Amino acid sequence: MATGGQQKENTLLHLFAGGCGGTVGAIFTCPLEVIKTRLQSSRLALRTVYYPQVHLGTISGAGMVRPTSVTPGLFQVLKSILEKEGPKSLFRGLGPNLVGVAPSRAVYFACYSKAKEQFNGIFVPNSNIVHIFSAGSAAFITNSLMNPIWMVKTRMQLEQKVRGSKQMNTLQCARYVYQTEGIRGFYRGLTASYAGISETIICFAIYESLKKYLKEAPLASSANGTEKNSTSFFGLMAAAALSKGCASCIAYPHEVIRTRLREEGTKYKSFVQTARLVFREEGYLAFYRGLFAQLIRQIPNTAIVLSTYELIVYLLEDRTQ
């Protein structure tokens, strides 16, 4: 049985490992997050494309011109940002992201580890129900604490300025939100974040199941030394990527709703009202705008975060024992 000192040491270890993993992942995948947020926004510029309608019965063969709006894809948005705003705009929101991601991941993993200890004493140890309740509890606490920082980050990512013009920094953006919307403005999109807990639960339930399978796999048990560590590390990366990919596809619509709720001067007021309005005005496909960018960002990001976390825990636990 762990003593009070050992439990405190374990909590600090999970805080540190989670913070390091989150920071590394945020830096590497920031440009993709900016593109994803732009794609999710209702302010995404639509290109009007004109398709000629051909009438065979006319002498000229040409008829009316029919305008059709086309939503730009990932590469069009990337090209637009580079041409109009410059490469620095691909790192918009990195400041609040770095300020928030380390404590966010640290709080999440510490809460997750602590909750798992508690739920293991109530349910069958390390069962799926333990992972589900632990992930849900950790996500709820983390979302409640960190929403103001993510709100500022989203606003900064949505700000579009031409190349060379001055953009708001993190403190200026936070001050502007407070002056125009008050304290409540920092909690816009929180209901959508709570809905997104389902994604976290799905992700960790799949991840823990895959991790358990990898530990019991014949290849893992037959390997030894460096080979075993290498196999485990890359296995965890693959498990993290797969679990996040599945979870993102299932629960993605809440991300679009959250971005809409965080837009400045928005017509979107609540989670349900936003969902109805987006569906009525843009159709169900609008709920999946930016999914491709999300997948190619989140899958490597989650793999980096979880594998860095597991690696640091493994290395430091060995040294403290």
UniProtKB/Swiss-Prot annotation:
- Pfam families according to UniProt: Mito_carr (PF00153)
One GO cellular component term of this record is: mitochondrial inner membrane
One GO biological process term is: mitochondria-nucleus signaling pathway
What switches on expression, per the entry, is described as:
By INS or IGF1 through the PI-3 kinase/mTOR pathway.
From the Swiss-Prot or TrEMBL record, state where the protein is found: Mitochondrion inner membrane
Tissue-wise expression:
Expressed in the central nervous system. Also expressed in testis and skeletal muscle. Weakly expressed in heart, liver, kidney, prostate, colon and peripheral blood leukocytes.
List the molecular function annotations (GO) for this entry. pyrimidine nucleotide transmembrane transporter activity
Q: Where are the transmembrane segments?
A: 12-32, 49-65, 121-141, 190-210, 233-253, 298-318
PROSITE patterns reported for this sequence:
SOLCAR
Q: Does the keyword Flavoprotein apply?
A: no
Its keywords, alphabetically, are: Membrane, Mitochondrion, Mitochondrion inner membrane, Repeat, Transmembrane, Transmembrane helix, Transport
Q: Which domain of life does the protein's organism represent?
A: Eukaryota
Keyword check for Transmembrane helix? yes
Q: Which InterPro entries match?
A: Mitochondrial_sb/sol_carrier (IPR018108), Mt_carrier_dom_sf (IPR023395), SLC25A33/36-like (IPR049562)
**Topology versus the membrane, per the UniProt entry?**
Multi-pass membrane protein
Q: How is its activity regulated?
A: Inhibited by pyridoxal 5'-phosphate, 4,7-diphenyl-1,10-phenanthroline, tannic acid, and mercurials (mercury dichloride, mersalyl acid, p-hydroxymercuribenzoate).
Question: Solcar repeats: which residues?
Answer: 9-118, 126-213, 231-315
The protein's annotated catalytic reaction(s) are: UTP(in) + UDP(out) = UTP(out) + UDP(in); dUTP(out) + UTP(in) = dUTP(in) + UTP(out); 5-methyl-UTP(out) + UTP(in) = 5-methyl-UTP(in) + UTP(out); 5-methyl-UDP(out) + UTP(in) = 5-methyl-UDP(in) + UTP(out)
Which family, according to the similarity comment? Answer: Belongs to the mitochondrial carrier (TC 2.A.29) family.
The protein's job, in short, is:
Mitochondrial transporter that imports/exports pyrimidine nucleotides into and from mitochondria. Selectively transports uridine, thymidine, guanosine, cytosine and inosine (deoxy)nucleoside di- and triphosphates by an antiport mechanism. May import (deoxy)nucleoside triphosphates in exchange for intramitochondrial (deoxy)nucleoside diphosphates, thus providing precursors necessary for de novo synthesis of mitochondrial DNA and RNA while exporting products of their catabolism.
Q: What name does UniProt use for this protein?
A: Solute carrier family 25 member 33
Species of origin reads: Homo sapiens (Human)
